[in-house]
């Protein structure tokens, strides 16, 4: 039995949620999101909460039960609070700047990398070595942060590169003479 799936997702005041068949639509102060729940799972909206139940007891249905409940909870949290990922840049001369709808990254290559900021996502650089990716869709925020990190992922000897703010880089010792 899914411990995550058992709990109904409370819908706070100021948020409207509608369940139309297998589609859950959530509208809040920050925007509107929708998610299509897999067919193996039934979703209902009652008493100010959205509950998710498996249609059968197959292993796949039970796995999708917890996943679907977590996805619906992320929709509600996204339209109320939003999500953000912080990235840090380590390395001499490595920096980032936002110019309009473009994130400009100087990461030690012969050219600057220009990353087009997608709609629905805000990227800010409070300092030249700090990037904050924010939005209402948790999956997109994480995906964009991962794409930015991928341009120069941290290396294990000096730790140079783009890393998540809470990420620990396992360091290696250099060659010995």
UniProtKB/Swiss-Prot annotation:
UniProt keyword list? Ribonucleoprotein, Ribosomal protein, RNA-binding, rRNA-binding
Show the coiled coil region(s). Answer: none
Q: Does the keyword Phosphoprotein apply?
A: no
- Which Gene Ontology BP annotations are present? cytoplasmic translation
Q: Name one GO molecular function term.
A: structural constituent of ribosome
For this UniProt entry, what's an example GO CC term? Answer: cytosolic large ribosomal subunit
| Domain of life assignment | Bacteria
**What does this chain do?**
This protein binds to the 23S rRNA, and is important in its secondary structure. It is located near the subunit interface in the base of the L7/L12 stalk, and near the tRNA binding site of the peptidyltransferase center.
**Quaternary structure per UniProt?**
Part of the 50S ribosomal subunit.
What is the name attached to this protein's record? Large ribosomal subunit protein uL6
> Gene of origin?
rplF
């Amino acid at each position: 039995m899914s411990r995550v799936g058992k709990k109904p997702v409370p819908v706070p005041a100021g948020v409207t949620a509608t369940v139309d068949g297998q589609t859950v639509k959530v509208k809040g102060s920050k925007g509107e999101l929708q998610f299509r729940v897999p067919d193996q799972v039934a979703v209902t909206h009652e008493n100010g909460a959205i509950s998710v139940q498996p249609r059968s007891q197959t292993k796949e249905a039970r796995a999708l039960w917890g996943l679907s409940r977590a996805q619906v909870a992320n929709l509600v949290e996204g339209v109320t609070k939003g999500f953000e990922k912080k990235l840090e840049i380590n390395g001499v001369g490595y920096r980032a700047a936002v110019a309009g709808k473009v994130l400009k990254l100087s990461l030690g290559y012969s050219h600057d990398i220009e990353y087009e900021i997608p709609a629905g996502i805000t990227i800010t650089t409070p300092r030249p070595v700090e990037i904050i990716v924010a939005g209402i869709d948790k999956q997109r925020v994480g995906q964009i942060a991962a794409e930015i990190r991928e341009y120069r992922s941290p290396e294990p000897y000096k730790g140079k590169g783009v890393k998540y703010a809470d990420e620990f880089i396992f360091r290696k010792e250099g060659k010995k003479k």
